[in-house]
Structure formats: C-alpha cells, structure tokens
UniProtKB/Swiss-Prot annotation:
Keyword presence, 4Fe-4S: no
Coiled-coil stretches noted in the UniProt entry, renumbered to this chain: none
PANTHER family: DNA-BINDING TRANSCRIPTIONAL ACTIVATOR DEVR_DOSR
Stretches assigned to the HTH luxR-type domain: 155-220
Annotated region of DNA binding: 179-198
Name assigned to this protein: Monoamine regulon transcriptional regulator
UniProt keyword annotation of Transferase present: no
Lineage top rank: taxon: Bacteria
Amino acid sequence: MSALLKASRNDAIIARCLQTISQLIPLTSAVFYRVNNRLKPENYILHNISDNTHQQYLENFQPLDPLLPSHFSHQNTTVAAMTPRLCDRNRHYYHEFMLPNNVRDMTEIFIRRERRIVAGISLMRDVPFSSEERQRAQAVLPLVELAIRDCLQEEDDLPAILTAKEREIVGMVREGASNKLIARQLDISLSTVKTHLRNIFAKTEVVNRTELVSRTWMPAAQRTLHL
C-alpha cells in the first residue's frame, strides 16, 4: 500500500473514531491531533469545525490554550477539563476565541505511550459537559487507543536530503502553520517561504502540503516506496 493511500485510510479511521465519540458524548465539534517530540500538536483532523476557525486558533490563540499537551506532559492526566477556574485564569482565550466560536466548554483526551503524550482529541461543546460525560470520555479512551493504534506508528527523522531550514518549515507545515505564519515566525519573506516549499516538494516528490504531511507521517518502511 502506498504511503498516501495508507495516510488516507488512517485519516478515515480517525474521522470515524471522532464521529463515534460524538455519538456517545454529544459534541459541537472535535479535533484529533498527533503530538511531536516537542509536545506540539500536528497532523490535525477536524470534525465539524471550519478551516478558518482552525487557522484562527493556530495563528492567534494556540499559545494561550490552557489544555495544550505541554501543560500535562509531567502528569498522568488522560482527560483534562476546562474548569471554571481555568476559564477565569484564561479570560482572553475564553472570551476572544471560545465564546465567539460558540464553544462554552472543552474536554481534552490525551493518548499516551509509555507516559509520553503522542496524540490528543479536543472535544468542544456549546453547553458544559457533565461530570458523567467526562467519565464517559475517560471510559472510552481504551477503545480509542485500540482503534487508532496502527495510525500512531513511530516516525523517523525527515530524509537527509532536506536542509535544516527545510526540515523546520516541514515541521511547521505539519503543525498547521500558514505560509504567512511561517514567514513571520522565521523572520523571512513570504516569497522565500514559497521558494523553500517548492524545493521541499521537489525533493520529497510531492505536489502539495497535504501530500507532504502524509508522506512525512509515514514510517521509514513506507517512505521508501517513494524514493
């Protein structure tokens, strides 16, 4: 099976998993993501949430998110709640991002391997979650882990054909950053970002961002099918 077909199948499995969770726990929207070695989310799969809203989150609000995996890496937490105390301590995030997007409560599910967070699922709703529903999220976690186990294979480093700057840009693409955000964070021009991406596409034999993310998601055994 090609890397792209395998990635498409994995995405479908995860999307189905999100849909199943939404049937067990009524949701407004949900997001699945992998967590890289820097504890940053990447490879997002969205359920009932617009690309514009997601991009707004990435560009303006992600650093303010109190439920980021990095806040829970030294704990054993597998389900985290957006408690009233957290809302009060993170008023800007709650009032400027959550409420305008009709999100009044969030529950975060963390998927771990040997205690390290390797993936997560954000559950969002326009009404508060009950304690029973949060317990249900905790109870469904083993089933989620089993369902997506094969989708969470370990990755090797990017091919040596990429420069350090190109690998950095690929990492940002996988985290969902737009060209504009990449340019701003790396302090380079937008045209330079586009030039880097063209070179990356040529070296990795892909034609767009989606294929790039799919290919770099695959373990080395799958990646060699394209070399």
